[in-house]
């Protein structure tokens, strides 16, 4: 029970931090105007097209080559899916709108800020469209259906502008994530090669005349050899010439300590040496990725 409560508290704190980060003053001046403008234009285009094609009449069909205009009503969701059960489209499109609106609120990613409104308002447009009755040519009023009119080929599914917004949003988000993953891997590989070579040499690589610029980093000892850490501007290094701490990161497993400690700089889990039963010194688990935050025994005792 205690573990579950701790998990809920941690989740709550994470959500609060994410919300604050995604709604900082500078960011909300950009993201919510984007949401409003894109929402306005998506809804405007959807219902201008709906009105235009309704005037052409249900059943109207013309072909311009690649694009065929085929005006029909659709009781399903995008591309005529689930058209046998009227409850499913309402549920799916409403959930889609709510989920992606919440995702937008908690997002600070620039690509998502631009693309999520396409999906959100595409889904909302279909929900509104479905709630507006359509009068057929024979005078029959049809409810719980959207108006579809675009078709690539005679044999393909028929869709509307809201469907285009949803599919385009999903496709571009997927493409963005693929590109980000590729760039992150490339950057990480490049960074690992460059920083590892630099750190392996450590204090040895700093000329004697340059060492005077480095000062003791008060109360910070190397988590691996317990020697004094040195600091110069925003760079930190172990003063032990024989300390190859970058190699030892492999034996420093993320071991939770009492009142689990997180790095104050990057919020990653703090680690200790496997044989350090007293947790004399802790270091950020990203110690080999240029996050040099450490915590001495003295600091731990003060926080207890």
From Swiss-Prot:
Coiled coil: none
CC terms in the record's Gene Ontology section: plasma membrane
Subcellular location, principal: membrane
GO BP annotations listed: proteolysis
Location in or out of the cell: Cell membrane
Pfam families: Peptidase_A8
Membrane recorded as keyword: yes
Class of the enzyme per the UniProt entry, highest EC level: hydrolase
Molecular function in Gene Ontology: aspartic-type endopeptidase activity
Catalytic reaction annotation: Release of signal peptides from bacterial membrane prolipoproteins. Hydrolyzes -Xaa-Yaa-Zaa-|-(S,diacylglyceryl)Cys-, in which Xaa is hydrophobic (preferably Leu), and Yaa (Ala or Ser) and Zaa (Gly or Ala) have small, neutral side chains
Keyword entries, A-Z: Aspartyl protease, Cell membrane, Hydrolase, Membrane, Protease, Transmembrane, Transmembrane helix
Active site: 148, 163
Membrane topology type: Multi-pass membrane protein
Protein's pathway: Protein modification; lipoprotein biosynthesis (signal peptide cleavage)
Stored InterPro entries: Peptidase_A8
EC numbers for this chain: 3.4.23.36
Membrane-crossing segments per the record: 28-48, 86-106, 112-132, 163-183
Keyword Transmembrane: yes
Function: This protein specifically catalyzes the removal of signal peptides from prolipoproteins.
Family according to the record: Belongs to the peptidase A8 family.
PANTHER family given in the database record: LIPOPROTEIN SIGNAL PEPTIDASE
Protein name as it appears in the record: Lipoprotein signal peptidase
Native source species: Mycoplasmoides gallisepticum (strain R(low / passage 15 / clone 2))
